[in-house]
Amino acid sequence: MHEIEVNRNSHLIDPQLHIWGWEVPVYLFLGGLAAGIMIFSALMGDRFPLEQRSRWARWLPFAAPLLLSVGMLALMMDLEYKLHVYRFYLAFRVTSPMSWGSWILLGIYPATIGLGLANLQAGEVAALGSWGPLRLLKGAIGWGHDFASRHRRGVQAANLVLGLGLGIYTGVLLGTLGARPAWNSALLGPLFLVSGLSTGPP
């Protein structure tokens, strides 16, 4: 029997496994944290009146888009073709978890900002509108507060649905990868959702 030892390593011939850098784990953690914040903030609205909540609890929804933006920036750094991101928003494919996730991420910003504005008291709305660069948006902040306050139940429902979608879609996306047998499971979506809730506010 002859033994052949091969010392070459060609990515065009030999199978390669791509190992994630720090960018993807950062996005997964911050995305799960944002999902937990959205879900708990939405559920808190039905259980605790605004008068019984601390200032931190009322301002908490604003943290979700900030955390998500940092996570998406990290994810963008991991992409090879960064200029092609816009193509996700040129179509919607019902059978594609990545397409669902792209549109969910887009809807999170108005939903979380609306819930945050609805939670503010009158004095806080005025203070927010007079702070630094937000002075240019003072009128929009006041209008957003009035609109979100009138439609509070709808805004809470949007945060709950989008938070659940954000928490579960990444697991569903990874679960469709047949090349990773350990990931190819229907349990991965609920697992990501529970993990996201565990990182949310207590």
Q: Model-predicted segments: where are they?
A:
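Membrane-interface interhelical loops and short amphipathic "cap" helices
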Residues: M1-V24, L50, L79-S99, G144-H145, ...
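An N-terminal structural lobe/cap that precedes and organizes the functional/catalytic core
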Residues: I4, H11-V26, G31-G32, G36, ...
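Long, contiguous internal "core" modules enriched in hydrophobic/ aromatic residues
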Residues: G21, L28-G32, G45-Q52, A57, ...
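Central hydrophobic cores of alpha-helical transmembrane segments in multi-pass inner-membrane proteins
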Residues: L33-G45, L68-V70, A111-G116
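Membrane-interface helix-loop-helix modules in multi-pass inner-membrane proteins
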Residues: V70-W131, L174, P181
